[in-house]
Swiss-Prot record:
InterPro entries: PLC-like_Pdiesterase_TIM-brl (IPR017946). Its EC number is 4.6.1.-. It catalyses: an N-(acyl)-sphingosylphosphocholine = an N-(acyl)-sphingosyl-1,3-cyclic phosphate + choline; an N-(acyl)-sphingosylphosphoethanolamine = an N-(acyl)-sphingosyl-1,3-cyclic phosphate + ethanolamine; a 1-acyl-sn-glycero-3-phosphocholine = a 1-acyl-sn-glycero-2,3-cyclic phosphate + choline; a 1-acyl-sn-glycero-3-phosphoethanolamine = a 1-acyl-sn-glycero-2,3-cyclic phosphate + ethanolamine. Expressed by the venom gland. The lineage of its organism: Eukaryota, Metazoa, Ecdysozoa, Arthropoda, Chelicerata. This is Dermonecrotic toxin LrSicTox-alphaIA1ii. Its cofactor is Mg(2+). Residues 19-26 form a propeptide. GO terms for biological process: killing of cells of another organism; lipid catabolic process. Glycans are attached at N282. Keywords: Cytolysis, Dermonecrotic toxin, Disulfide bond, Glycoprotein, Hemolysis, Lipid degradation, Lipid metabolism, Lyase, Magnesium, Metal-binding, Secreted, Signal, Toxin, Zymogen. Mg(2+) binds at E57, D59, D117. Changing T258V: Little decrease in enzyme activity.
Amino acid sequence: MLLYVTLILGCWSAFSESAETDVAERANKRPIWIMGHMVNAIYQIDEFVNLGANSIETDVSFDKDANPEYTYHGVPCDCGRSCLKWEYFSDFLKGLRKATTPGDSKYHAKLVLVVFDLKTGSLYDNQAYDAGKKLAKNLLKHYWNNGNNGGRAYIVLSIPDLNHYKLITGFKETLKSEGHPELMDKVGHDFSGNDAIGDVGNAYKKAGVTGHVWQSDGITNCLLRGLSRVKEAVKNRDSSNGFINKVYYWTVDKRATTREALDAGVDGVMTNYPDVITDVLNESAYKAKFRIATYDDNPWETFKN
């Protein structure tokens, strides 16, 4: 009996040490969000997640009254992609909700973050607040199910124009007036126009944003772009007084570019080919430093190694 107890305790001790080692190794690896690019049709959610994406980017176009209308990019778009796939925005949100609600037959546990690329270029500056207000109402009804067991993914509102910072204000104030200010815990922000980092910071000050900031940098895969601004964003992220929490680079379709982006310290890679990014992350040099982010990773928290 004593021998049996000794064996059990020995096994438990070894198991505990192994578990502690796994936790420590996980904590030392930067979590990476593989962002499936231009996922605008509901069926593409499955397609991109099955290829390895744990995040998707979806385009949102607005009508003349600042209502979010379609998930649609249009031409031109990335080389090698169809630019014309679309859904009604409300329908896409319902499909997305199913894909991110535990227990649903379409649920993907892996899909933890959604970037809405808000095509506000069709709007006047003074419509930005209304666009945020109407966007919030759509998400509240069709994605969050009015706060009753809705989709669980984190949401990034990506705005191309710094002058449209009031979209953030309209979104936040609407969730509050509708009785669900807590949902802002699931919402982050990005200005995607490749503006000067200092100008981006000033826009956030105007919007009253003090956290949950992703900073994008990039260009269509048809063209080349260096990593100098990415490195500037990473420097801001890692400084004691920076406003950026996470940095992502788009559109990355090649292994060499993926390695360069990871070496620069990004947290996310937006791609048309998630399997390419997964392959690079599985290379020994990168497997030791990075891991694919899960729902347990807070996308608003700056990674400290």
